[in-house]
Swiss-Prot record:
It catalyses: choline + A = betaine aldehyde + AH2. InterPro entries: FAD/NAD-bd_sf, GMC_OxRdtase, GMC_OxRdtase_N, GMC_OxRtase_C. It comes from the Eukaryota. Residues 1-34 form a transit peptide. It comes from Rattus norvegicus (Rat). This is Choline dehydrogenase, mitochondrial. Expressed in liver. GO terms for molecular function: choline dehydrogenase activity; flavin adenine dinucleotide binding. Its EC number is 1.1.99.1. Pfam families: GMC_oxred_C, GMC_oxred_N. FAD binds at residues 47-79. The keyword Transit peptide applies.
């Protein structure tokens, strides 16, 4: 279904349903806080400058402007998530099923690529990242997964004191408004609408039944007591529309006179006086401008842009900066290091019944799906179709799940940039705590040049063995009786791939990013030479500068990254405002009865 509206005209008209919803937004009154520019010679100050209106930046813009004494400037390199020149929502972003349209389009997307990967047969991988209001929450598959409680306890052990599960859970709950209501794990009053998968599609039902037949439990809530098992996914979809952080946090704050939100604005460097951050320099409409702060500059550009901007500003490995002629403000060798991502592989089967999303690519069917969504926000356009999934342990002795599954009643080829070839279904499966760690470095001093990105995929034997398990365990699930009415031939990797050597070769040839880069501005103790920010999210070695986004994770979590990134921003906002930390939430968390078996 990801291919449904790739060929639709950008001049599509919006009927009453879409217009009525879009009209709920209110225009922002003019802000008196004029941005200082090189041309004017002015020096207007803001309390905070937030760089990046993405998953974290939108949260911060909202929470910081709750205090009317805070004047906040929010700078986004990309455009608004609205139709050009109007207040109407851009359907390409807000229609859940149209997500591939943005993965294929650099208008809202940084369109990064990695360096050639030796562990993946020398392939260069495509890394889409959001460049629009909402950031990657406006491009992603809308899957809301927090990870496992032990991910956050591990952060605490790695030096991010106060970021254990008991101290993070309250901020997951603060952000969330779950359609099923609040409990000890879920939030019920937050701005982020979260819904639960509810499709009756026979292939989703077969997937859940097959997992049970293979001996895995059903879990009622992957974000609650028990992550381990298979069940219905939570999604950031509300009333048939994508619910990004732009919808949840930014739009409600735009009417505040103490918030100025600029788009099409590329920040080129942080301005320093000595080691104190005093503002930023940015490019807009081809002109250089400067804006200044009385308190702090906050980088929320994500795991690629935030370390890139730090290095462009003179904060990073001094030897690397000197080679490019960048004056060193602070030698901080951890900047851009510790890069972690989730890798995944698609296991695909032909379907013997015409019930997959293949038919949705037919021109007339596309029109019908699009019109139903535009009119009512219902139908196949109102979901990304990744409504079931699961988490399991790869082998005995693993304490909590390290493999994740997303099921899709369709076939994905080249990130959805190529149409499906036939009736088919697939599982996205991958490991969640790889031991391979990468890096990113500046390619040049030009802020418009993408940095060198080296995830170092499959560089350890452990990671190769874990992916071998991913393939074998997925095949076992697909072989269960529940899929018998639908099971055609295995399309990928194909029945001819059987030996460990053949499976390894398949993984190296076909594995791809799950789009979860993180950890490049690691949070830790100031005494840790690899740390970039402290437990308060302050950049070590300088003043008045923070990083708040997925880059500060000490290690990648066991699941998708959007929910944890929003949590990080909520928690950091309280730190900045000096609010008392929300109370400990010591809730029960499932543990396997034995680690002697894999399930």
């Amino acid at each position: 279904m990801w291919q449904v509206l790739r060929s639709w005209s950008k001049r599509c008209l919006s009927p009453r349903g879409a217009l009525a919803w879009a009209a709920q937004g209110q225009p922002r009154p003019p802000c008196s806080c004029a941005v200082a520019s090189a041309a004017s010679g002015g020096k207007d100050e803001y309390t905070f400058i937030v760089v990046g209106a993405g998953s974290a930046g939108c949260v911060l813009a909202n929470r910081l402007t709750e205090d009317p004494n805070h004047r906040v400037l929010l700078l986004e390199a990309g455009p608004k998530d609205l139709l050009m020149g109007s207040k109407r929502l851009q359907w390409k972003i807000h229609m859940p099923a149209a997500l591939v349209a943005n993965l294929c389009d650099d208008k809202y997307n940084w369109y990064y690529h990695t360096e050639a990967q030796p562990g993946l047969d020398g392939r260069v991988l495509y890394w889409p990242r959001g460049r629009v209001w909402g950031g990657s929450s406006s491009l992603n598959a809308m899957v809301y997964i927090r990870g496992h409680a032990e991910d956050y306890n591990r952060w605490h052990r790695q030096g991010a004191e106060g970021w254990d599960y008991a101290h993070c859970l309250p901020y997951f709950r603060k952000a969330q408004k779950h359609e099923l209501g609040a409990n000890m794990y879920r939030g019920g009053d937050g701005p982020l609408h979260v819904s639960r998968g509810k499709t009756n599609h026979p292939l989703h039902q077969a997937f859940l039944q097959a997992a049970r037949q293979a001996g895995y439990p059903f879990t009622e809530d992957m974000n609650g007591f028990q992550q381990e098992g298979f069940g219905w996914m939570d999604m950031t979809i509300h009333q048939g529309k994508r619910w990004s952080t732009a919808s949840a946090y930014l739009r409600p704050a735009l009417s505040r006179p103490n918030l100025r939100a600029e788009v099409q604005t590329l920040v080129s460097r942080v301005l320093f006086e000595g080691t104190r951050a005093v503002g930023v320099e940015y490019i807009k409409d081809g002109q250089s401008h400067k804006a200044y702060v009385s308190r702090e500059v906050i980088l929320s550009g994500g795991a690629i842009n935030s370390p890139q901007l730090l290095m462009l500003s003179g904060v990073g490995n001094a030897d690397d900066l000197k080679k490019l002629g960048i004056p060193v403000v602070c030698h901080l060798p951890g900047v851009g290091q510790n890069l972690q991502d989730h890798l995944e592989i698609y296991i695909q089967h032909a379907c013997t019944q015409p019930i997959t999303l293949h038919s949705a690519q037919k021109p007339l069917r596309k029109v019908c799906i699009g019109l139903e969504w535009l009119w009512r926000f219902t139908g196949d356009g109102a979901t990304a179709h990744l409504e079931t999934g699961g988490f399991i342990r790869s082998r005995p002795g693993v304490p909590h799940p390290d493999i994740q599954f997303h099921f899709l009643p369709s076939q994905v080829i080249d990130h959805g940039r190529k149409p499906t070839q036939q009736e088919a279904y697939q599982v996205h499966v991958g490991t969640m705590r790889a031991t391979s760690v990468g890096w990113l470095k500046l390619r040049s001093t030009n802020p418009q040049d993408h940095p060198m990105i080296n995830p170092n995929y499959l560089s350890t034997e452990t990671d190769v063995e874990d992916f071998r398990q991913c393939v074998k365990l997925t095949r076992e699930i697909f072989a269960q009786e529940a899929f018998a009415p639908f099971r055609g031939k295995e399309l990928q990797p194909g029945s001819h791939v059987q030996s460990d050597k053949e499976i390894d070769a398949f993984v190296r040839a076909k594995a791809d990013s799950a789009y979860h880069p993180s950890c490049t501005c690691k949070m830790g103790q100031p005494s840790d030479p690899t740390a970039v920010v402290d437990q308060q999210t302050r950049v070590i070695g300088v003043e008045n500068l923070r990083v708040i986004d997925a880059s500060i994770m000490p290690s990648v979590v066991s699941g998708n990254l959007n929910a944890p990134t929003i949590m990080i921003a909520e928690k950091a906002a309280d730190v900045i405002k000096g609010c008392p930390a929300l109370g400990d939430e010591n809730v029960p968390v499932y543990k396997p009865q034995t680690l002697d078996t894999q399930r």
